[in-house]
């Protein structure tokens, strides 16, 4: 049996759904699942210190291979002793492969069997990223969990295109496995693609499972499809993945999508959503979305969320936070970002308890009753 650096331990299955309570063991510690992972694109979660992230219960964070390759460079980070030392974070780190960022540069990229040529968004220079290069960068970064280089096809692309794409992604995954220099202390995940086509998802999953990765990601979702379409893809994709390995749904952070992903057997999630909307003064609360910059909060001396015990809600009022944001004070963004991240990390803590109590469906109903059933129409 292969001795993986990343191990999944199942603690309990929920009786009424596909949800599972567990933990993932990594070279930099163990974290409970299901877990939401804050995104630290440039080796920092925007405006948050490592100490603040630990205080809110973030057991793992994500960093971005593409951005760190371009700046400051993966070789510089390797000289610093790896990403953990560079950013002073002693807990697990997951890095993506750069594939999604290249996907988002659709107007300036060219995909071949060898890899992807694209324009550097910082200076316009021509760049080339291959499966081997994506693995080499992540080996230099030293993350605990790495991602295979993949193409993320658009959800509504034609069947023939998506079929060719997933077959190439499988070949890229095999090349990445061969290029992996540190399988003893970095776990490489395969990424299942296939857009909304069940047979292609099945083909992609079968290819990757045969390669025996330490964990598996479900990619190509949260890219414009409806909430119902995402759930349908998870319904037929998650059961294809091994029960004894972690399952990661990439790029998902809306509260209803997190709960629905857990119900379908997902263990890990990430998204820039909580910090991105926080910078515009949009806050997640137990009673739904709150835009604290609105004029009606100018004299509101209550917390962002009466049911939240985070640092922001324990110490500051809506009126004060609104003032900071209107005055372009960074501290305001720090407070809203901390609150939103805490909200999702704490939501997952409640979800884990609901799995333990076998009442996840009741928890979902109660949560959405207060939060609002139309969350999927809010981009939130």
Curated annotation (Swiss-Prot):
One of its GO terms (molecular function) is metal ion binding. Substrate binds at residues 96-100, 150, 193, 220. Residues 251-257, 275-279 are annotated as: RNA binding. Keywords: Glycosyltransferase, Metal-binding, Queuosine biosynthesis, Transferase, tRNA processing, Zinc. Its EC number is 2.4.2.29. PANTHER family: QUEUINE TRNA-RIBOSYLTRANSFERASE. Catalyzes the base-exchange of a guanine (G) residue with the queuine precursor 7-aminomethyl-7-deazaguanine (PreQ1) at position 34 (anticodon wobble position) in tRNAs with GU(N) anticodons (tRNA-Asp, -Asn, -His and -Tyr). Catalysis occurs through a double-displacement mechanism. The nucleophile active site attacks the C1' of nucleotide 34 to detach the guanine base from the RNA, forming a covalent enzyme-RNA intermediate. The proton acceptor active site deprotonates the incoming PreQ1, allowing a nucleophilic attack on the C1' of the ribose to form the product. Belongs to the queuine tRNA-ribosyltransferase family. This is Queuine tRNA-ribosyltransferase. It comes from Streptococcus uberis (strain ATCC BAA-854 / 0140J). The gene is tgt.
